[in-house]
């Protein structure tokens, strides 16, 4: 990967081409402009469906690495990098993961979240350097995110990941025929030309966010962070999340809010441990030991001790 791709004509890339549907965008009445965007924003979902085999392969490969002590890194610049940071930041509260398990690495660091630092994306060695500063190693996973597939910062990081035996996953919105990327798993979300030519924060950004939602959630399901469709490892850190935890206990274990609150207090805020205690009758110490031995999936831990959750899962409404 060269240190810079300055002077390269990217006009042939799918993400840079002009969309014929929006040639007169500036002349459209507002209602027609909105309708055009609504219709065009169906493309990210279709792109995701076409990429389903690669996404499934990525979920299984990442989950296997994380189950063996590895970590997941998202690497990107601009919108792509910000989306990676956003997804990584949601994992600790949703799945009670340590913040270092899933990390978003953005060209330019934290200041680039608020102020554009797109010039930094042209430095291929910067991607490798930012990963090395975080101790990125052979047991880890990298998802390199670049809508147009040509970002040197991301390509340098992917090349480094492959060179040390880490799992390298590319995520781009152009075809591999147009732009090959160094990777083990290649996710291509072909959303087509943007309504504002080249503005990949639009459809490409939407598809990227959807893919990251799927990857992180799928991995956490595989790691036992979800029972049925409930986030049984939710971090109880505020009133809303405490309420959600109490409703999970009510719906799955059939306990009252008062009983649920007592169980949460006994379990140190662990919903999964509280559910096991409610279903099995085990006290805290043996329940914790049982979960450590037979988890992390609650279903497996329950099966081993012959316990069943007495509640019937109820749909959770929007919060």
What function would you assign to each model-found segment?
Residues 2-47:
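Cofactor-/ligand-binding subdomain signature composed of acidic, glycine-rich
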Residues 15, 36-44, 104-115, 227, ...:
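Gly-rich Lys/Arg/Thr-decorated short loops/hinges at beta-loop-alpha junctions or inter-strand turns
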Residues 44-53, 144-151:
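Short, glycine-rich nucleotide/cofactor-binding loops
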Residues 50-65:
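A short, well-structured juxtamembrane/interface segment
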Residues 61, 157, 215:
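Aromatic/hydrophobic pocket-lining residues that form π-stacking "cages" and hydrophobic walls in ligand
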Residues 73-211, 219-223:
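Glycine-rich phosphate-binding loops that contact phosphosugars or nucleotide phosphates
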Residues 214, 219-319:
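Short, amphipathic alpha-helical interaction segments embedded in low-complexity terminal/linker regions
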């Amino acid at each position: 990967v060269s240190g810079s791709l300055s002077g390269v004509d990217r006009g042939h890339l799918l993400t840079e081409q002009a969309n014929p549907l929006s040639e007169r965008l500036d002349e459209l009445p507002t209602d027609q402009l909105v309708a055009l965007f609504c219709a065009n924003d169906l493309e990210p979902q279709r792109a995701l469906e076409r990429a389903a085999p690669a996404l499934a392969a990525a979920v299984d490969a990442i989950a296997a690495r994380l189950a063996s002590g590895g970590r997941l890194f998202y690497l990107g610049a601009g919108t792509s990098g910000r989306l990676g940071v956003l997804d990584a930041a949601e994992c600790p509260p949703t799945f009670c993961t340590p913040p270092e398990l899933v990390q978003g690495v953005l060209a330019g660091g934290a200041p680039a979240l608020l102020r554009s630092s797109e010039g930094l994306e042209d430095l291929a060695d910067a991607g490798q350097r930012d990963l090395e500063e975080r101790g990125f190693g052979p047991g880890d996973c990298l998802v390199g995110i670049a809508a147009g597939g040509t970002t040197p910062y991301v390509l340098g990081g992917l090349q480094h990941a492959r060179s040390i035996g880490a799992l390298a996953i590319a995520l781009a919105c152009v075809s591999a025929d147009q732009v090959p990327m160094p990777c083990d798993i290649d996710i291509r979300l072909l959303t087509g030309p943007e309504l504002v030519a080249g503005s990949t924060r639009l459809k490409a950004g939407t598809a990227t966010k959807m893919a990251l939602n799927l990857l992180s959630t799928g991995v956490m399901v595989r790691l036992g962070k979800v029972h049925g469709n409930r986030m049984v490892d939710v971090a109880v850190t505020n009133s809303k999340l405490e309420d959600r935890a109490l409703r999970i206990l009510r719906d799955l274990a059939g306990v009252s809010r008062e009983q649920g609150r007592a169980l949460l207090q006994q379990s140190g805020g662990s919903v999964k441990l509280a559910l096991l205690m409610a279903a099995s009758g085990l006290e805290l110490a043996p329940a914790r030991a049982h979960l450590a031995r037979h988890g992390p999936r609650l279903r497996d831990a329950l099966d081993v001790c012959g316990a069943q959750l007495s509640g019937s899962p109820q749909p959770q409404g929007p919060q």
